[in-house]
Amino acid sequence: MSADAAAGAPLPRLCCLEKGPNGYGFHLHGEKGKVGQYIRLVEPGSPAEKAGLLAGDRLVEVNGENVEKETHQQVVSRIRAALNAVRLLVVDPDTDEQFRKLGVQIRGELLRAQAGPEQAGPPAAPGEQGPAGENEPREVEKSHPERRELRPRLCAMKKGPNGYGFNLHSDKSRPGQFIRAVDPDSPAEASGLREQDRIVEVNGVCVEGKQHGDVVTAIKAGGDEAKLLVVDKETDEFFKKCKVVPSSEHLNGPLPEPFTNGEIQKNNPETLAPAASESPRPALARSASSDTSEELASQDSPKKEDSTAPSSTSSSSDPILDFSISLAVAKERAHQKRSSRRAPQMDWSEKKELFSNL
């Protein structure tokens, strides 16, 4: 009997949203004394409003997964994991109450089974793309261009009674300033800001390489409004492969291509060229030897090593003879300092030797 009664009851709605520049445009919250997550506010002209989402709707499924018993943060994480598009199965309060009285659990299968003949009715508004069964392959088809178009996001927010509602921190393992946490129902959450996002620009000014205090100061300088250009981890890695700093031009403009070998080969010599031009000879010395102490030695140390190396192989070259009698020469110089007046006698003997050689 419950199935027959459910056939005449209003149906849940499947709302397919595509993220816009300011996010999806709805606020999610939990109500005291009630189980589940509810739509608190739908912004005018937003993707949520166009998809047919209504304030007061209860969220049943996110991308085909039941979320009725999940916490607020778990539901938010599921929605964020959907990248730029999400499918929400929702029910309005009247429909929710009728299904509870009938003892029927709301599921996506119920919508597919009973909504087919009634697609011309009210449920057709959020599902203009076709029945729920047809939406799934289309979403799969969209997943490929979404991955190719990894773009930064512009999160515009106005300060509320408790501030913007996000925490900023720096990660020792990665350069930059990151979003550590986003408070539920905060201006930051409404703007589409996500945990682990990296801030690229603050109010149109690039903050790449800035310290934590500088970024905080830039945000505070905006007064009660802030526009943060951010990238998630995947988008950040994409732009790093392209060796391009994300900017507001990449919100809708052309994206760089990271997977061409030509670009990588052009960029690599630029980074290696300064090191090679500054000290080419030490670079060759490092490649020829695995001894790390050579890197800290001066240019005189290789000369000593070059001179000592052949000493064990030959004894006919003059430099080696000089090194072999270095102690004797030192002693002679010491004696010469002590008895410098006896030097002329040595000069006469040297002159005789020179004359004989000539």
Swiss-Prot record:
The modification N-acetylserine is found at S2. The modification Phosphothreonine is found at T292. Changing S287A: Abolishes phosphorylation. Detected in ileum, duodenum and in kidney, where it is found in the glomerulus, the proximal tubule, the thick ascending limb of Henle's loop and the cortical collecting duct. GO terms for molecular function: chloride channel regulator activity; protein-membrane adaptor activity; signaling receptor binding. Phosphorylated on serine residues. One of its GO terms (biological process) is negative regulation of phosphatidylinositol 3-kinase/protein kinase B signal transduction. GO terms for cellular component: apical plasma membrane; cell periphery; cytoplasm; endomembrane system; filopodium; membrane; microvillus; microvillus membrane. Signal peptide: none annotated. The keyword Cell membrane applies. Residues 114-151, 247-358 are annotated as: Disordered. Scaffold protein that connects plasma membrane proteins with members of the ezrin/moesin/radixin family and thereby helps to link them to the actin cytoskeleton and to regulate their surface expression. Necessary for recycling of internalized ADRB2. Was first known to play a role in the regulation of the activity and subcellular location of SLC9A3. Necessary for cAMP-mediated phosphorylation and inhibition of SLC9A3. Involved in sperm capacitation. May participate in the regulation of the chloride and bicarbonate homeostasis in spermatozoa. May enhance Wnt signaling. PANTHER family: NA(+)_H(+) EXCHANGE REGULATORY COFACTOR NHE-RF1, PDZ DOMAIN CONTAINING PROTEIN. Homodimer, and heterodimer with NHERF2. Binds the N-termini of EZR, RDX and MSN. Binds the C-termini of PDGFRA, PDGFRB, ADRB2, NOS2 and CFTR. Binds ARHGAP17, EPI64, RACK1, OPRK1, GNAQ, CTNNB1 and PLCB3. Binds PDZK1. Interacts with CLCN3. Binds the C-terminus of PAG1. In resting T-cells, part of a PAG1-NHERF1-MSN complex which is disrupted upon TCR activation. Forms a complex with CFTR and SLC4A7. Forms a complex with SLC4A7 and ATP6V1B1. Interacts with TRPC4 (via the PDZ-binding domain). Directly interacts with HTR4. This is Na(+)/H(+) exchange regulatory cofactor NHE-RF1. It comes from Oryctolagus cuniculus (Rabbit).
